[in-house]
Amino acid sequence: MTIAFQLAVFALIAISFLLVIGVPVVLASPEGWSSNKNVVFSGASLWIGLVFLVGILNSFIS
């Protein structure tokens, strides 16, 4: 269970880093939002899911 928690936290940190870098780049590029909005929404959905997963796994670890 600890390994799953650590992997979920690592994935959350990695996705957060990618979103912090990627979203401003997409918004600043011409035609970027209209062509990449599905990718941004998928990344945000994955991030929200990982936040809940880390919270649930944390309740089992603590």
Curated annotation (Swiss-Prot):
The keyword NADP does not apply. Pfam families: Ycf9. Its main location: plastid. One of its GO terms (cellular component) is chloroplast thylakoid membrane. The chain crosses the membrane at residues 8-28, 41-61. It is found in: Plastid, Chloroplast thylakoid membrane. HAMAP family: PSII_PsbZ. Belongs to the PsbZ family. PSII is composed of 1 copy each of membrane proteins PsbA, PsbB, PsbC, PsbD, PsbE, PsbF, PsbH, PsbI, PsbJ, PsbK, PsbL, PsbM, PsbT, PsbY, PsbZ, Psb30/Ycf12, at least 3 peripheral proteins of the oxygen-evolving complex and a large number of cofactors. It forms dimeric complexes. This is Photosystem II reaction center protein Z. The gene is psbZ.
